[in-house]
């Protein structure tokens, strides 16, 4: 089992609705919507798994990439004292709940994917690293949410970031 599995289990215990929303988003990303009017997370570039979207949620919320650290954080561990607290766990889940709509927002998701398509990535076979896509999405959301970066500037920056992280394997 991976750290993401443990975190998803914690979500099932303390926030089942959040886990279900993440799973539904991932299911929808794999199938073409039945009606043209339905806005969907479907795309040809990446088919995210729940642990992938969890990584995005954690990256946006806690600005951390190591799932091991996140597991401790959402269990309610105070990183300074090492003590576990029910109150702290509740606060951490509240932070996750606040950011989940942002990462699952289809406008954000499709706008980000347009950045990759604009860079010449037309289908999944051209993507060499799923993690590069995920971390680029985290940076896209941080730029949009935390720094209020103009959309055209954000698209340019994230497009360059994705190409360089794909070429170098560093993100």
Region spans (language model):
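Flexible coil/loop and intrinsically disordered segments
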Residues: 1-171
């Amino acid at each position: 089992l991976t750290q993401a599995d443990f975190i998803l289990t914690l979500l099932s215990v303390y926030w089942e609705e959040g886990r279900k929303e993440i799973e539904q988003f991932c299911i929808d990303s794999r199938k073409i919507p039945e009606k043209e009017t339905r806005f969907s997370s479907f795309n040809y570039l990446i088919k995210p798994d729940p642990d992938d979207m969890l990584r995005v949620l954690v990256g946006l919320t806690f600005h951390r990439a190591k799932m091991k650290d996140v597991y401790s954080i959402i269990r309610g561990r105070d990183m300074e004292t090492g003590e576990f607290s029910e109150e702290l766990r509740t606060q951490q889940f509240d932070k996750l709940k606040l950011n989940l709509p942002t990462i699952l927002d289809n406008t954000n998701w499709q706008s980000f994917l347009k950045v990759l398509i604009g860079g010449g990535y037309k289908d999944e076979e051209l993507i060499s690293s799923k993690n590069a896509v995920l971390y680029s999405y985290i940076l896209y959301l941080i730029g949009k949410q935390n720094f209020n970066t103009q959309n055209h500037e954000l698209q340019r920056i994230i497009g360059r970031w994705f190409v360089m992280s794909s070429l170098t394997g560093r993100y």
